[in-house]
Amino acid sequence: MQLGLSVSDSDASPFTPLAVLELAHDTKAEAIAWLLNRIRDKQRNGGAELLVDQLLFPAQDGQKPNPNVFVVGSTLQRLLSGAEDVGLFKEFQDGTMRGFTYANRESFKDFEGDGEGFLGDAECQYIVKHELDTLRAKNEEYIPGYPKYKLYPGKSIVRRLQSKGVLVQYFPLHNKEDLKRLSFSWYKKIKLSFQPLDDIRSYFGEGLGLYFGFLEYFTFALIPMALIGIPYYLFDWEDYDKYVLFAVFNLVWSTVFLEVWKRCSATLAYSWGTLGRKKAFEEPRAGFHGPLGLNPVTGREEPIYPSSKRHLRIYLVSVPFVLLCLYLSFYVMMVYFDMEFWAISIYHENPNFATSVLLFVPSIIYAVVIEIMNLLYRYAAEFLTDWENHRLESSFQNHLVPKVLVFNFVNCFASLFYIAFVMQDMVLLRQSLATLLITSQILNQVMEAFLPYWLQRRRNKRVYKRMRRLMGDKELPLLEQIQLETEMNTYLGTFDDYLEQFLLFGYVSLFSCVHPLAAVLVVLNNITEVYSDAFKMCHVFKRPFSEPAANIGVWQLAFETMSIIAVVTNCALIALSPQVKAYFPESDAQLILTVVAIEHVLLAFKFILAFVIPDVPKHIQVKLSKLDFESLEALKKRKILEVAET
């Protein structure tokens, strides 16, 4: 994909664009010149040493286009040296994964000639992003042309430009040929086989590769439960006593499922070079603010915000707000039960087809309300977490995730707990679970895939018509592509995707013993989810930058917490079984003590199983230990040589 357009630097040779930078329409000329100079400048002078050219779009319907759109690329040698700077791991000749060094490039597998094709597309774009993000202010006091926009020595220029609205967006470009091949092998043909995870990782990066790996693993892991659930559904529909065995299987399955996933995740992460990779030093978030102070770790000046003030905001504002939202969720739940009782009373007064259909209406309305409340709360939680002013993105996520998980858990499952343990109505529990699950699946598919696709398709048609009308029959595939991708929606990460799978895991593990078909419904949902998520990543959203990941992060803990709650829930459901109650006809206290004892035994078994099954396969542990040993030996030899020289 060679650049053959009007450019701002006539001396620049054509190069392959890897990313797009869009500055604000009214950005000062001196700020643009300063930024481009820093991007092009040599590394020894504090620059990124990248290639950058300006795109000149034609006027659109009498409106002047944004002239401040630039494409960024790099020479091959700069990418290879950048791979060493970011600590990229590649496969060595002996089959182990090692940190890439330019000096030893010939010792790495698949490195041939000058190294063309050695780095994947996503890796090249990640290197470019890293070099842009680590462009640091030197002795400038402010952004040229903006005296009020202060610069701090040693701090990221790009993050400062983003926080002040000068840099509108920057994103990696799609590679049409690679995308076409990936689309064909991924979702354009119906097949009963595994996803091309290595190709997904090579194109989108490790973070998305692990998400789709988890989605695939979760779907296949549900198949045994689905196969067992079908005969239970067909032959023992009203016999809840038979579901005791299904509940026990559920408990064992949820533990084994998560422990085996850790091993699968470690295998994928090692083969992709992220398992033993050290995390880069985390820069402050773009929105972080506070009075200027000295960072005790780096010794640089940067905004400082007292943790005491942040804690006051959390405990005096955020926590009460979350509790208020939980109260509103309970209130809406009680309104739903009033509607449910009203529908049941009408059915009992006049049982016919119309009133039998009416029985499902309250649950459907409640499911829609749940999705709306989850969406509104998500925006509020993000606003509050941003207002708490966390310095690092990891801290921001660690405070956002619990807020969202707690509310979504209560909002989605509180009614089911109430029906199961207060009303003790298993028929209504089965009906409500099925209705909530099916309705939420349909709404998620519409909101996540079909609606964005329809909006993007309309937007694409407008762009195609406008570009063809302006440029006639001229060949402009790259210009047209960049125009399209600039107007695409930004992919906000895997948060919502993991959240959806977390809730589905809850439906399966918490109450599936009273509705064994839940696993079947989730399997069908996830099969369509694979195709819809693949399509939206390829054609609906901007291509995201690669995000190195060694596991699914905080979501592993979230799923494990859900599995522990599932043990308690299923033990309680077993205790409500008439068959179990028959063993304790005279003493409810004895029944409760027995169930609690069994629950503790199952939890102990769960933790023992988690301890017995290693998180990392033995052969990978050996390779990692071997690498650590060789690194220590190399360090010893270097110290001996230094001593000998002195």
Swiss-Prot record:
Localization recorded for this chain is: Membrane
Stored InterPro entries: Anoctamin, Anoctamin_TM
Q: Which GO terms describe its molecular function?
A: chloride channel activity
Q: Does the keyword Membrane apply?
A: yes
GO terms under biological process: chloride transmembrane transport
How this chain sits in the membrane, per its record, is:
Multi-pass membrane protein
Which keywords belong to this entry? Membrane, Transmembrane, Transmembrane helix
Its UniProt miscellaneous note says: The term 'anoctamin' was coined because these channels are anion selective and have eight (OCT) transmembrane segments. There is some dissatisfaction in the field with the Ano nomenclature because it is not certain that all the members of this family are anion channels or have the 8-transmembrane topology.
Q: What does this protein do?
A: Does not exhibit calcium-activated chloride channel (CaCC) activity. Can inhibit the activity of ANO1.
The similarity comment for this entry is:
Belongs to the anoctamin family.
Q: What is this protein called?
A: Anoctamin-10
Organism, by scientific name, is Danio rerio (Zebrafish)
Q: What is the lineage of its organism?
A: Eukaryota, Metazoa, Chordata, Craniata, Vertebrata
